[in-house]
Amino acid sequence: MSGGLDCLALKEDDVQKFLASGAHIGSSNLDYQMTQYVYKRKPDGTYIINLRRTWEKLLMAARIIVAIENPADVCVISSRPYGQRAVLKFGAHTGATPIAGRYTPGTFTNQIQAAFREPRILIVTDPRSDHQPVTEASYVNIPVIALCNTDSPLRYVDIAIPCNNKSIHSIGLMWWMLSREVLRLRGAISRDVTWEIMCDLYFFRDPEEAEKEEQEARDRATAVKEEPAQPYAEQWSDPVAVPPAGQPVAEVTDWAADSVKAPVAGIGTYGGPSEDWAVADAPAAPAAPTPAAPSQEFTATDDWGGAASNDWAISS
């Protein structure tokens, strides 16, 4: 398919991308029409796709897309979530019309609905999951290009690009290579220069993981922000010097310079406040002894209610 041209030959860098994304790994089932694209079968029953045939079909599909004058007449569809980001990026870079998500039945056949389209060529991610647009394309004679696995049905498929259409990285890489080859054939980018768009842009990203990464980035940015320096007083009794508005606060670089030593309290008995911290506290005067209370002597009497008396006739 490359016609012996070195510029169209499969490069080693592209082969490494194919192997890293797992584009050569098929499924454990094999459709009889996909037998020609199988290289060998692994001991565990998984089929290996011939990457040379994948590259040839990729070039053929790119040449067909470039032959269409209006890029908007190319319709790319992916109902599976793994290929929706890829078809949207493909449409943004090549000018094709993407349909990501649920396909509305009758888009190609029902002329009275608002979503009616008449594309000149249709490209689908999986002919099994996108069977509705493939079937409708056969009704109105629209050629179909599909990314096909070893077990994909080829009914109504005109050009099958053999690859792994189940892997996230494989789907993104195939759409990225197809868009790169289309732009090269149009002359938009040079073959001697590496395309500035990375294939990671075509990979599917989970919205929850993307939101988590954005939240972590915001948290890191918040932690990096430094708080502004606040004015301080050297003594507790000194007023705080507040700089005027608009003037930056001087930053303290050496906290050990001109530091004020705090007074150290004595170990002895506290003798009251002193104006001069350098003067030692005077020893406290000894306390005077407390006088003892006078002792009282009591005389035993027979009369418990009054004083002692010898005359019993006298009332107390």
Curated annotation (Swiss-Prot):
GO biological process: ribosomal small subunit assembly; translation
GO molecular-function terms, A-Z: structural constituent of ribosome
Chain segments annotated as coiled-coil in the UniProt record: none
Subcellular location: Cytoplasm
Chief location bin: cytoplasm
Keyword hit for Oxidoreductase: no
InterPro entries: Ribosomal_uS2 (IPR001865), Ribosomal_uS2_C (IPR032281), Ribosomal_uS2_CS (IPR018130), Ribosomal_uS2_euk (IPR027498), Ribosomal_uS2_euk/arc (IPR005707), Ribosomal_uS2_flav_dom_sf (IPR023591)
Ranges of compositional bias, category Basic and acidic residues: 215-228
Keywords: Cytoplasm, Ribonucleoprotein, Ribosomal protein
Subunit structure, as described in the record: Component of the small ribosomal subunit. Mature ribosomes consist of a small (40S) and a large (60S) subunit. The 40S subunit contains about 33 different proteins and 1 molecule of RNA (18S). The 60S subunit contains about 49 different proteins and 3 molecules of RNA (28S, 5.8S and 5S). Interacts with ribosomal protein S21.
Family statement drawn from the similarity comment of this UniProt entry: Belongs to the universal ribosomal protein uS2 family.
Function (record text): Required for the assembly and/or stability of the 40S ribosomal subunit. Required for the processing of the 20S rRNA-precursor to mature 18S rRNA in a late step of the maturation of 40S ribosomal subunits.
Protein name per UniProt: Small ribosomal subunit protein uS2
Source organism per UniProt: Tripneustes gratilla
